[in-house]
A protein has these predicted regions:
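Hydrophobic faces of well-ordered beta-strands that scaffold small-molecule active sites
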Residues: 21-23, 51-55, 79, 123-127, ...
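Alpha/beta enzyme core
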Residues: 15, 61-95, 99-182
Length: 316
């Protein structure tokens, strides 16, 4: 997820139980032009393995060259191709979900990456179920990707036109899993252990992928594992623990070489901080305050005030 799954957040998710992770997606053209900012999106630590680097683009040969270049920098455990991003600026460059409308071009991209990688690491794909409700072609696309050498496919159960509205269509995801021999990983509307258990029970998927739920609740990985292993629903994480993690994330972001000065790091963190506030007492006011922070100290003060107010409330 662009702007979300950076090296710092992946570290946090790994500590909280994530099994396999993928970097923010990177432009193949940015990689080929030796853009330093783009290269930073591919960074990961060995502690985060297994981890894949996700690429997007519309030219199979260039995508393959970019994948090979990434492997030369620091070999990821796999290369993932993005056929799912619905964002206009990506679609306009014939990347992401735009290729779902053009299966020959999609096949050329998948084959190009597989050829460029040459078996050095597995190549996987992330996709949506179609461009819109009239062109749901996920089963066809999965078969094409399997023929092109993909070794696993993650399917998000919405069309490009849906964005993140409506419900994920797990019937289509199930049909994809039954149509190919390679693993299909289901994604969409997974926010708890109960959600994961239901989808694993009711569909033929080989695995499940948690996305947006982790943005406000990175404990979801640990909670889901506990439910799958024991059937027990974990107690909600205490507000104090939540703020401790928020502050740790801020400090890690500031010390990360990616963001530079503290002010820039905290400005980049604003959207992340607002996401963390989901379910916090007084979340609306907190988001308004966090949208303006420029230092860790400001977040510390906001956290202290939030905890003090919660302690004074009848339910605190």
């Amino acid at each position: 997820m662009a702007g979300v799954t950076d090296v710092v957040f992946r570290q946090i998710c790994k500590e909280l139980g994530a099994d396999v992770m993928v970097t923010e997606f990177v432009s193949a053209e940015g990689i080929m032009q030796a853009d330093e900012r783009t290269r930073k999106y591919t960074e990961f630590t060995d502690e985060q393995r297994p981890v894949g680097v996700q690429l997007f683009g519309g030219d199979g040969e260039r995508m393959g060259e970019a994948a090979k270049k990434i492997i030369g920098w620091k070999r990821p455990d796999f290369i993932d191709i993005n056929f799912g991003c619905p964002v206009n600026k990506v679609v306009a460059k014939n990347g992401g979900s735009s290729l779902l409308k053009d299966c020959p071009s999609l096949a050329a991209v998948a084959s190009g990456v597989a050829k460029g990688v040459g078996g050095e690491v597995p190549v996987t794909a992330k996709m949506r179920i179609g461009w819109d409700d009239r062109t749901i072609n996920a089963v066809e696309v999965c078969r094409i990707l399997e023929d092109c050498g993909m070794q696993a496919i993650a399917v998000h159960g919405r069309t490009r036109a849906q964005g993140y509205s409506g419900d994920a269509n797990w019937e289509v995801i199930d049909a994809c899993a039954r149509a190919v021999k390679i693993p299909v990983i289901g994604n969409g509307d997974l926010a708890s252990g109960e959600d994961l258990a239901r989808r694993k029970r009711e569909t033929a998927v080989s695995g499940v992928m948690i996305g947006r739920a982790a943005m406000h609740n990175p404990w979801v990985f640990r909670e889901a594992k506990r439910y799958l292993e024991t059937g027990e629903v974990a107690e909600p994480v205490a507000l104090e623990q939540r703020w401790e993690l928020v502050l740790r994330h801020c400090r890690l972001a500031v010390t990360s070489a990616r963001y530079g000065a503290e002010r820039h790091a905290m400005m980049a963190m604003r959207a992340r901080l607002m996401a963390y506030c989901k379910g916090f007492p007084g979340a609306k006011e907190l988001r308004q305050r966090l949208a303006r922070v420029e230092s860790v100290t400001e977040v510390e003060d906001i956290a202290a005030a939030s905890l003090a107010a919660a302690a004074l409330s009848p339910s605190g």
